Amino acid sequence: MSLEIFLRSAGHGIPATINGEPMAGVSGPVTIAGAAAVGNAEILAGIVVNQLLEPGRPMIYNLGLAHVFDMKAATAVTGGPENALFAQISAEMGRFYNIPSSSWVSTESCFTDQQAGLEKMFGFHTHLSLIHI
């Protein structure tokens, strides 16, 4: 699906956000560093394909969609502290490659409550401190 989108949008100068989304412990190594390395490889592969289709196409590096898997509860953790680490890694790798980076902020709460507010605040603090677009 991604390749089809890349093909259809190539040649129009549309910036492409390349997302790496390994799930630590499932589709990537269980460690944050290992999952970040897999996500980085995914992103670099997407950038190479896009640059072959349209040399000079603007790219956005996004490892912020990576998350971990809670093996005890058998569920993906999308609002845990590990997500802030992935956002920081995304920002630093974007700076390393001199590519704009992006990420996202999520929560584990199912309601608009204090937990949701606290987790979003931690996420936004991370983004406001480190990530530039």
How would you name each of these model-derived features?
Residues 1-129:
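Helix-rich catalytic cores of soluble enzyme domains
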